């Protein structure tokens, strides 16, 4: 008798007890949603929910399409400035990131991710060399070599592409106003 009384008082409400949640007799397979439009409520019943264990090919292919992102192709000028900024400092302040992004026409997220990837590459280069050779990977050693300068991110075939570095970039310290000179 007590169960009948409690069930009658809960008819308009949802019970969150474990027994009620796991009871298959209380699950009817539909969901009710309410949409408020012009201060008027109208209940809508959606189609029965699908079995989560059933394969859903349409959703799987849609998820692959959504996760596919176009890779950013940086120009040589953008890479020069990004590399020069990285040689100056391996970590950017919010202000520096904003200045570089606006000067290069990139989003701050693109600049941030480029720096993260470049730091990862730099750390791998440090780990790959012995103690004596680590000094060759230091920022000062790289900036003192005006002949060749490696482009980041071209590691698909394990080939490193080089381009000659212009010497006037070497003596320019990072400053937001100097970015436009590059």
UniProtKB/Swiss-Prot annotation:
Residues 52-63 have a biased composition (Low complexity). Residues 24-63 are annotated as: Disordered. Disruption phenotype: Morpholino knockdown of the protein results in impaired neurogenesis in posterior regions. Expression of the neural precursor marker ngn1 is reduced at the one- to three-somite stage. At later stages, there is a significant reduction in islet1-expressing primary motoneurons and defective axon outgrowth from motoneurons. Formation of Rohon-Beard neurons is initially abnormal but later recovers. Development of secondary neurons is not affected. GO terms for cellular component: nucleus. Residues 67-126 bind DNA. GO terms for molecular function: DNA-binding transcription factor activity, RNA polymerase II-specific; RNA polymerase II cis-regulatory region sequence-specific DNA binding. GO terms for biological process: cell differentiation; negative regulation of DNA-templated transcription; nervous system development; regulation of neurogenesis; regulation of transcription by RNA polymerase II. Disulfide bonds: none annotated. Residues 29-43 have a biased composition (Basic and acidic residues). Residues 1-34 are annotated as: Important for interaction with tle3a. It is found in: Nucleus. Signal peptide: none annotated. Keywords: Developmental protein, DNA-binding, Homeobox, Neurogenesis, Nucleus, Repressor, Transcription, Transcription regulation. Belongs to the NK-1 homeobox family. Interacts with tle3a. Transcriptional repressor. Activity as a repressor is enhanced by binding to the corepressor tle3a. This is Homeobox protein pnx. It comes from Danio rerio.
């Amino acid at each position: 008798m007590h169960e009948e009384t409690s069930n009658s008082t809960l008819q308009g409400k949802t019970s969150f007890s474990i027994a009620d949640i796991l009871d298959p007799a209380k699950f009817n397979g539909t969901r009710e949603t309410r949409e408020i439009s012009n201060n008027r409520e109208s209940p809508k019943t959606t189609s029965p929910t699908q079995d989560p264990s059933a394969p859903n090919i349409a959703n799987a292919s849609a998820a692959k399409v959504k996760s596919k992102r176009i890779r950013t192709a940086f120009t040589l000028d953008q890479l020069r400035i990004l590399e020069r900024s990285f040689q100056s400092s391996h970590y950017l302040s919010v202000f520096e990131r904003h200045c570089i992004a606006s000067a290069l026409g990139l989003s701050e997220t693109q600049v941030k991710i480029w720096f993260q990837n470049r730091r990862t590459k730099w750390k791998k280069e440090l780990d790959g060399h012995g103690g004596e050779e680590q000094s060759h990977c230091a920022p000062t050693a790289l900036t003192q070599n005006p002949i060749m300068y490696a482009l980041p991110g071209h590691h698909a075939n394990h080939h490193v592409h080089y381009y000659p570095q212009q010497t006037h970039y070497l003596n320019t310290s990072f400053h937001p106003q100097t970015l436009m000179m590059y």
